UniProtKB/Swiss-Prot annotation:
An example molecular function term from Gene Ontology annotations: antiporter activity
Short motif LXXLL motif, span: 453-457
Topology relative to the membrane: Multi-pass membrane protein
InterPro entries: Cation_efflux (IPR002524), Cation_efflux_TMD_sf (IPR027469), DNA-bd_dom_put_sf (IPR009061), SLC30A9 (IPR040177), XPA_sf (IPR037129)
Name of the gene this protein is made from: slc30a9
Annotated NCBIfam families: CDF (TIGR01297)
Organism classification: Eukaryota, Metazoa, Chordata, Craniata, Vertebrata
Compartment(s) where it occurs, according to its Swiss-Prot or TrEMBL record: Mitochondrion membrane; Nucleus; Endoplasmic reticulum
Gene Ontology CC terms: cytoplasmic vesicle; endoplasmic reticulum; mitochondrial membrane; nucleus
Function (record text): Mitochondrial proton-coupled zinc ion antiporter mediating the export of zinc from the mitochondria and involved in zinc homeostasis, zinc mobilization as well as mitochondrial morphology and health. In nucleus, may function as a secondary coactivator for nuclear receptors.
Protein's UniProt name: Proton-coupled zinc antiporter SLC30A9, mitochondrial
Native source organism of the sequence: Xenopus laevis
Length: 559
């Protein structure tokens, strides 16, 4: 008590007490602060400093009905009662009952830390590669069957990462030894690959041996139909046209004929590049290119557009300007007219082949001819179409300018024809560069197609809503679809319960007596429900691909 009397008022006010201030009825007393375990009186400045502390115990009461706290505070209460002369006896205001504390049972929160990997699963291949183990080392480990992430396979075996690490430490002794072994194996693998690249024949044999099980498309079949057929026909015809136009230019010296020869040469080289792009786009995906090589068609078409501008337009402008600055007399143009007429027929035939192919493809996609061309849905055929259209117009332009030169004897008209053909080629190259660049950047599919895919997902009972939909055209009639899905947890849980024995689940519930039993029950069924949710995602992806064959890659994220 002496310590309490000696303390200052500021220190007494800083006591951490949950209390409610009430007025004290005793004479000379200003305030009284009361808590469940502590009663503290604040005297006025006119009276000697006094403090009365009453402690309550939550233990059982004694047989006489009193408590330790009540007996301990009886004498101070009597002394306070004597302070008021009008009240000879003052009753105690303290509650006689002990404190009742109700404790809520909760599970202890587990601290996993910033890095927790004890519940991670890894496949057998990763265990062998990352921890340098042998198949015999995995036989003694716990094997767990999990749902496969692939649609066409069943459940597969995984191992706990902690078990694999413990086995690796048992085999190798320390993490440093594992790191050294992994580094040595990596060096051996690099040396092995270098040896393979030294012999192309062995490389092909080893690639086939190492598991490229998907059948490759036959190159012959690829160029016998569709865009491949159009490109091969264009290469043959433009190659012949270049040869004959070159002979006509050597014989006549016409600037327009020189521009047409360059035009045919540029078309031949560009279409050979398109054929290379078509063959490369059919390559099967590999670990370095998981989405395949379909963009090779757009890349080849883009380079083709640049080549048309550099070789065709640039040289045509150059030769036309030289003809304007230094006009040269032109020989007889009879052979040139014959070659132009033959080229017009051949280029027109190639143009008709390209038009028929685009018309058939656009009808299959439900698009108009103009939309199909402007959206560059088939870049290879589009290049052939634009080149042949420019070739036909260029032939008409060259023949007109050569005719004016023959009638007037002025070679300037022929030079103007060369400039006109160069301008036409520049416009074609600009169109090809723009459309293929847009396709390579990543272009969305048609809005009505996106709406149809979204409605297909929203019509499923397990889906509440679809958000952040992204559907991009990957080329070659392939679509990549991505969306965030808000699943209905009740439907997913009901789907899980439909596959369970309800009587067995009820029996498990009746056996739950403690918090630990409840935790084990929830962990077991919670993990199974998560697996059911993953199965629902796989089911939706599979249905989306089956109903829309153009959708090749689906990424559904759980919201």
């Amino acid at each position: 008590m002496a310590g309490i009397y000696a303390r200052s008022w500021p220190s007494l006010f800083r006591l951490y007490m949950r209390c409610a201030g009430t007025r004290c009825s005793g004479h000379g007393w200003q305030n009284a602060l009361e808590s469940k375990g502590l009663l503290y009186f604040l005297p006025s400045s006119y009276l000697p400093i006094q403090a009365h502390i009453r402690l309550y115990s939550s233990s059982d009461q004694k047989e006489d009905g009193g408590s330790k706290g009540t007996s301990a505070a009886s004498s101070p209460e009597k002394s306070m009662a004597g302070l008021d002369p009008s009240k000879p006896e003052q009753k105690s205001t303290f509650p006689p009952d002990p404190i009742q504390v109700k404790v809520k049972a909760v599970l202890k929160k587990r601290e996993y830390g910033t890095k927790y990997m004890k519940n991670n699963f890894i496949t057998g291949v990763r265990a062998l590669n990352e921890f340098c183990l042998k198949p015999s080392d995995l036989e003694s480990l716990r094997k767990i069957r999990r749902r496969s992430p692939h649609d066409d396979t069943e459940a597969f075996t995984v191992y706990l990462r902690s078990d694999v690490e413990a086995k690796a430490y048992e085999v190798w002794g320390s993490p440093e030894a594992i790191f050294r072994e992994r580094k040595m194996r990596k060096e051996e693998e690099i040396a092995y690959r270098e040896n393979l690249f030294r012999n192309q024949k062995l490389l092909k044999e080893y690639k086939d041996f190492l598991g490229n099980t998907k059948p490759r498309l036959s190159t012959t079949n690829m160029f016998m139909k569709g865009p491949g057929k159009v490109v091969i026909v264009a290469i043959c015809i433009n190659g012949l046209n270049f040869f004959f136009k070159l002979l006509a230019w050597v014989y006549t010296g016409s600037a327009s004929m020189f521009s047409e020869a360059l035009h045919s040469l540029a078309d031949t080289l560009n279409q050979a590049l398109l054929a290379l792009g078509i063959s490369q786009s059919a390559r099967t995906p590999d670990p370095g290119h998981p989405y395949g090589f379909t963009n090779m068609r757009y890349i080849a078409s883009l380079i083709s557009g640049v080549g048309i501008f550099m070789m065709g337009a640039g040289l045509s402008w150059y030769h036309g300007i030289i003809g304007l600055l230094h006009p040269q007399p032109i020989e007889s143009l009879l052979w040139a007219y014959c070659i132009l007429a033959g080229s017009l027929v051949s280029e027109g035939a190639t143009l008709l082949v390209a038009i028929n192919e685009i018309r058939k493809s656009s009808r299959a996609k439900g698009l108009s001819f103009y939309q199909y061309v402007m959206q560059s849905r088939d870049p290879s055929t589009n290049v052939v179409l634009m080149e042949d259209a420019a070739a036909v117009l260029g032939l008409v332009m060259a023949a007109s300018c050569m005719g004016l030169t023959s009638l007037t004897g002025n070679p300037l008209y022929d030079s103007l024809g060369s400039l006109g053909v160069g301008t036409l080629l520049g416009a074609v190259s600009a169109f090809l560069i723009y459309t293929n660049t847009e396709a390579l950047i990543g272009r969305s599919i048609q809005p009505d197609q996106v709406q149809r895919l979204t409605e297909l997902l929203e019509s499923d009972p397990a889906v509440r809503a679809i958000h952040d939909v992204k559907a991009t055209d990957m080329g070659m009639s392939k679509v990549r679809f991505k969306a965030e899905v808000d699943f209905d947890g009740r439907v997913v849980t009901r789907s899980y319960l439909e596959k369970q024995d309800i009587d067995l689940v009820l029996n498990e519930i009746r056996q739950v007596k403690t918090a630990e039993d409840l935790e084990a029950f929830m962990l077991k069924h919670g993990e199974n429900i998560i697996d059911t949710l993953g199965a629902e995602v796989d089911r939706l992806e599979k249905e989306l691909k089956q109903r829309n064959p153009e959708v090749r890659h689906v990424d559904l994220e759980i919201l």
